[in-house]
């Protein structure tokens, strides 16, 4: 019974090997994240007599190369939440923080939790890949928003309000009607210098070429508004270049966002819980994969309260002696990305109001009681997660063991 504790960092790790009753098999030593370094670690672990289990923290992306290579060598590997390791066995007045001490602490954790350790597997790699894509998706969403605001700021000086003319959603390739319109009619003079009939014909041909729906009344409305607008920048080659560059940057970010959205859905469809999650109200091909990416493997949660605590939407507790606080904010100690996705799901439920959905009924009830926005949204997220946990766990338990 050998517990291998690995404190992972960028490019290298500290390893300690222990047995029960504090027996040190190998004092903390350093390995590099290279082929030779990992192979030497595998040989050392295999040379130690008895069963060995390896535990490491899933910190950032650093641990993945070790977890993957050690699993490929048919060793038992378990990647744990750093918070669980940090809170383990803190019974000393001294505060010691070093890589060597952390490696020993992880090894002691492995011994204490030996029977409950969950083995890292190929499905974990798929989930990690999905989570990485989701974080990239979030990054490019922020980038797209910044590029959109930048373009609108420039257009306010050449064609004020053009971004409000169309509200159609983005296409699968990321293109949007208002952006394509602004790329062609980048200055108000591009519209009002033509006669009404000439603009209608030009706009109709543009819609046909770009495969957008044409409306004559909309064309007349656009032309009428253009007559009243006052631009700041003149209609010249430099202004056109500035706008074209801003449009290209926004289109590039939009294309990346939509391709990631599609790729995430394809990857998420390989997970066993995919059909159950996609059947839930408020969840679609965009939010569903995001939920699965951030929640991960449901089987690692022992009960419903564990998954709500992981998301940070569980009610806080503040009691001491005879004092008991009645209204306590939620813990917010979990994943902020998961809370954001849950709030988006709640927003979809409020907008679509499916009357037969228990989460929407709960949200509607709390709103009717006059609860503040964040109170009923957080309470709804809590209820949604509990239902998610129950349905997914029940479905997974019904599947044949592989």
Annotate the PLM regions:
Residues 1-402:
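A detector of single, family-specific signature residues
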